[in-house]
A protein has these predicted regions:
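Active-site metal-binding loops of divalent metal-dependent hydrolases
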Residues: 255-258, 283-285, 315-316, 349-351, ...
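Acidic/histidine-rich helix-loop elements
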Residues: 211-223, 248-263, 286-291, 354-367, ...
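Non-catalytic terminal accessory segments
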Residues: 1-237, 504-525
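Conserved beta-sheet core of the metallophosphoesterase superfamily
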Residues: 301-303, 307-310, 392-521
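His/acidic metal-ligating clusters that form di-metal
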Residues: 272-274, 341-346, 352-431
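Beta-strand-turn-beta hairpins that frame and shape the catalytic cleft
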Residues: 199-210, 242-251, 336-347, 352, ...
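Extracytosolic and intramembrane catalytic regions of membrane-associated proteins
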Residues: 225-245, 257, 265-274, 323-326, ...
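Core catalytic region of metal-dependent phosphoesterases/phosphodiesterases
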Residues: 146, 241, 254, 259-339
Length: 525
């Protein structure tokens, strides 16, 4: 038994180099860069190759030679595409992040390629081990003359020759035979080694990169100016910032951030100044839910000051977005009640997802918004729930219309417009507060025309909300919105009272955990 295990381990080690080569050379990921669908595939050609179809190919030295990367862009140069769209401001803006922070944008793609390479490598390892096992059984499976011919020494020699051939071809990749033309505008920058095999593409990229550089500089200046001005406005009102009263828990909530970099930073500064107990997002944290938006999720995850961050993802997010969120420590709600910061939070992701860079939606599961809402209500009736998060108002309407809903706070977004707080009174004198949160990213609708969202200041009011929960009864006694205007002024609204605890019936107060009347908490201003 011990000898068999040792032989298996030796076979696995011998097969590992070939399996690794197979895995790397066969890994691929389909995702988006800008508005175009792209297939990413790793190889050993030692360069990054961008295949733009009939327009030509672009080449860039790989930073991890001899491993290279092939990007095949779909739709470019097709008859259905307007050629002018290649130079439109919207398209250039969509690629700005690739120019300004290529490492951040591509890191999500690379993670996917690594996972696929591991999967392909494990498959190859299994096949090679099967081959070794069959070789060990060769005396039972093949003719004696073959056994005599294929000796261990000859098999080892073949293995060494194959490994040497493979390693040699990797370390000394073939030299390109096609013509290469430098792109002049890339000289001296991070794309200084960029070349193309088409004069047409050289002209396209000269124009495109020049446009991206101008747009990038303009947007970065605008974002910095907005950050500085909004921070100054916020700092001048430190005494008016939301803060909980005695016996209260303060919750920070927002929706539809849509990857806005300026607002992610400002909300982080606001959270640091106010110290909420928990942060909640009702979805649409990204623009398209692509791997390239990994940096957006990383920045958003830094918003809370070491407190729980829970999300009910929206129709612009994706399964990949949810995986990115979990990786950086955010909690993605999935229909189960989660205990966080002493609160029971319930929610689920949107059953509909947008196709990237499109207004079209596809169903991710056979469930309507209304059916999801009713399912969550049923869960809340059987498990104590303090907060219920969904993304779309269609679902929220079903929840808020449920008689005597046993949930003190319901939050949603999607419309990029604030509505509420709505207070629904129940038969026992308690209440539910519902809030349609605006857009924390200050984003115009429809999203299809807002490619610049991650790199621009808010285009409309960017909204953040603070909710005040009475620790004794669990009821929400107030809501305080904070608005970041497009002109960088910050408006801290007065606290809006949502219920009077002194009027709560004694039997309800006892049921909720308060044995005696609790005085109304006045707004702390």
């Amino acid at each position: 038994m011990g000898r068999a295990l040792l032989l298996t381990l030796l076979a696995a080690l011998a097969a590992a180099p070939l399996a690794a080569v197979w895995g790397i050379s066969h890994a691929q990921v389909d995702d988006y860069l800008g508005p175009h669908r792209v297939r990413f595939a790793s190889n050993f050609r030692g360069e990054v190759e961008l295949n733009l179809g009939p327009i030509g190919n672009a080449y860039l030295a790989s930073p991890v030679r001899p491993i290279g990367l092939s990007l095949t862009v779909g739709g470019v140069g097709s008859a259905s595409e307007n050629p002018d769209s290649l130079f439109s401001e919207q398209t250039l803006i969509a690629y700005t992040s690739l120019y300004t922070e290529p490492g951040e944008v591509l890191s999500g793609i690379v993670e996917g390629l690594v996972r696929d390479a591991v999967r392909e490598g494990l498959k190859a390892e299994a096949v090679l081990l099967l081959g070794v096992a069959l070789w060990r059984l060769r005396r039972r499976l093949v003719a004696p003359w073959i056994v005599t011919t294929v000796t261990r020494r000859r098999a080892a020699a073949v293995y060494v020759a194959v490994v040497a051939l493979v390693v040699g071809s990797i370390l000394v990749p073939p030299k390109p035979t096609d013509p290469r033309h430098p792109v002049s505008i890339a000289e001296g920058g991070q794309f200084s080694s960029l070349t193309v095999d088409s004069l047409l593409l050289a002209n396209v990229l000269d124009r495109g990169i020049k446009g991206i550089k101008l747009l990038s500089a303009r947007q970065q200046r605008a974002v910095k100016t907005y950050l500085d001005s909004a921070t100054g406005s916020l700092s001048s009102q430190l005494g008016d910032l939301p803060k909980p009263g005695s016996g209260e828990t303060m919750i920070l909530g927002f929706s539809d951030l849509h990857c806005n970099r300026a607002m992610a930073e400002l909300i982080s500064r606001l959270a640091h100044a106010t110290q909420p107990s928990i942060v909640l997002s009702s979805g649409d944290d990204t623009v398209n839910g692509t791997a390239a938006e990994r940096g957006c999720i990383r920045r958003e995850a830094a918003i809370p000051d070491e407190v729980p961050f829970l999300v009910a993802t929206g129709n612009h997010d994706s399964d990949l977005t949810e995986a990115q969120m979990r990786t950086v420590g955010m909690t993605v709600l999935d229909g189960q009640v989660i205990d966080a910061a002493g609160l029971n939070v319930l929610g689920d992701d949107d059953p509909e997802h947008n196709i990237p860079f499109s207004v079209d939606r596809v169903k991710e599961r056979p469930e309507s918004e209304e059916e999801m809402a009713q399912r969550l209500v049923d869960v809340a009736r059987n498990r104590h729930t303090d907060v219920l998060l969904v993304h779309q108002p269609v679902a929220a309407r079903v929840i808020m219309d449920s008689p005597n809903l046993p949930v003190p706070l319901v939050l949603w977004g999607h419309y990029h417009a604030e509505s509420g707080p709505a207070v629904i009174m129940h038969n026992d004198g308690s209440w539910t507060v519902g809030m349609q949160q605006g857009t924390a990213g200050g984003v115009h609708e429809p999203m299809i025309t807002s490619f610049s969202t991650p790199f621009s200041p808010p285009l409309i009011s960017a909204d953040v909300y603070f909710y005040f929960r009475d620790d004794t009864t669990g009821l929400i006694t107030g809501v305080q919105p904070v608005h970041f205007r497009p002109d960088a002024t910050v408006v801290i609204e007065d606290r809006i009272a949502t219920g009077d605890l002194a009027k709560l019936p004694l039997e309800t107060r006892i049921k909720l955990g308060g044995a005696s009347a609790t005085p109304t908490v006045e707004a702390s201003r």
